[in-house]
Amino acid sequence: MAKKLLVMAGGTGGHVFPAIAVARELQKQGWEIRWLGTKDRMEADLVPKHGIPIEFIQISGLKGKGIGALLKAPFAIFKAVMQARKIIKNYQPDAVLGMGGYVSGPGGIAAKLCGVPVILHEQNAVAGLTNVWLSKIACRVLQAFPTAFPNAEVVGNPVREDLAQLEAPEIRFAERGYPINILVMGGSQGARVINQTVPEVAKQLGNNVFISHQVGKGNLGGVEEIYQATGNGIAAEFIDDMAQAYSWADLVICRSGALTVCEIAAAGLPAIFVPYQHKDRQQYLNATYLADGGAAIIIEQQDFTPQTLLNVLQPLIADRRKLTEMAVKARAKATPTAAQRVAEVIIEQAK
């Protein structure tokens, strides 16, 4: 009889995509997978598209909520735990994998109540609040970066297989000349500061670069017109084939979410990171994983002006060898076996 895994992950691609990579790895080994999520977040559409059945509980975050919501929170959490417990009782999983998002909290508590082993994976350099709580009841805690939990095994972030299969950067870059291909990602929601600043710099860089700019939903206005005028770039709300985009690129300018940092390492690309300004400096610390190894440059959001970006870009554009060196250093920081290692731990811990 096939072993069963319940995956708890939701809210953002940074939680969902690594969890899908682990699910794929276990499916290859004959495991049955089911997902626990919430109806109003991205997993509701994304997970079924990958052929994985999903069950829903009702839960939302408490950050920024009013006093009324905080007073009701214990009842909402209790209700969500009971919903998750019912799903677990019916499904009878051999293990539960928590990959972050609000859904992991009630799901993890319910799994513990049902005597099902809980394995956690923290994607960021700073542990999320839900994972900090769940780490006290989990049988194993894994992490992408060495800074989230002091004694947890570092496995990296599971990324899509097609990224790890890209040719080594020194081979990809060997015959390239000009223009320098720059991939710009404002994130799925779009990062206004990146979307405003990069096109302004494009005006000054001329034919030395060609820019492929993912602006995020509803953010094409203004950006597209600038690239049409300069003739050295294109803009799109989304890029469907990220493996092809990474293969094409010589340099990436983007935020430094955990998954993005690990994808860039897997692809072997130099990066300019503009960390989102979390209170806990989460994205900044993610970015240091590559920046400290000489594979990336960090520009803080308040410093990300057209002139600062131009000053950083010009020496890189003038020296292809430097770009190749940074790309090789990025690839050296990759963890291509992360999904396999998480799957191994789940198999070890399954009841």
From Swiss-Prot:
Pathway: Cell wall biogenesis; peptidoglycan biosynthesis
Function of the molecule: Cell wall formation. Catalyzes the transfer of a GlcNAc subunit on undecaprenyl-pyrophosphoryl-MurNAc-pentapeptide (lipid intermediate I) to form undecaprenyl-pyrophosphoryl-MurNAc-(pentapeptide)GlcNAc (lipid intermediate II).
Family: Belongs to the glycosyltransferase 28 family. MurG subfamily.
Chain sites annotated for binding UDP-N-acetyl-alpha-D-glucosamine: 12-14, 124, 160, 188, 239, 258-263, 283
InterPro entries named among the record's database cross-references: GlcNAc_MurG, Glyco_trans_28_C, GlycoTrans_28_N
Species of provenance: Actinobacillus pleuropneumoniae serotype 3 (strain JL03)
Keyword Glycosyltransferase: yes
Reaction(s) catalysed (UniProt annotation): di-trans,octa-cis-undecaprenyl diphospho-N-acetyl-alpha-D-muramoyl-L-alanyl-D-glutamyl-meso-2,6-diaminopimeloyl-D-alanyl-D-alanine + UDP-N-acetyl-alpha-D-glucosamine = di-trans,octa-cis-undecaprenyl diphospho-[N-acetyl-alpha-D-glucosaminyl-(1->4)]-N-acetyl-alpha-D-muramoyl-L-alanyl-D-glutamyl-meso-2,6-diaminopimeloyl-D-alanyl-D-alanine + UDP + H(+)
Single GO molecular function: undecaprenyldiphospho-muramoylpentapeptide beta-N-acetylglucosaminyltransferase activity
GO biological process: carbohydrate metabolic process; cell division; cell wall organization; lipid glycosylation; peptidoglycan biosynthetic process; regulation of cell shape
Entry GO terms, CC: plasma membrane
Membrane topology: Peripheral membrane protein
Cell compartments where the protein resides: Cell inner membrane
Keyword Glycosyltransferase: yes
Keywords: Cell cycle, Cell division, Cell inner membrane, Cell membrane, Cell shape, Cell wall biogenesis/degradation, Glycosyltransferase, Membrane, Peptidoglycan synthesis, Transferase
UniProt EC number: 2.4.1.227
Protein name, as recorded: UDP-N-acetylglucosamine--N-acetylmuramyl-(pentapeptide) pyrophosphoryl-undecaprenol N-acetylglucosamine transferase
Database matches in NCBIfam families: murG
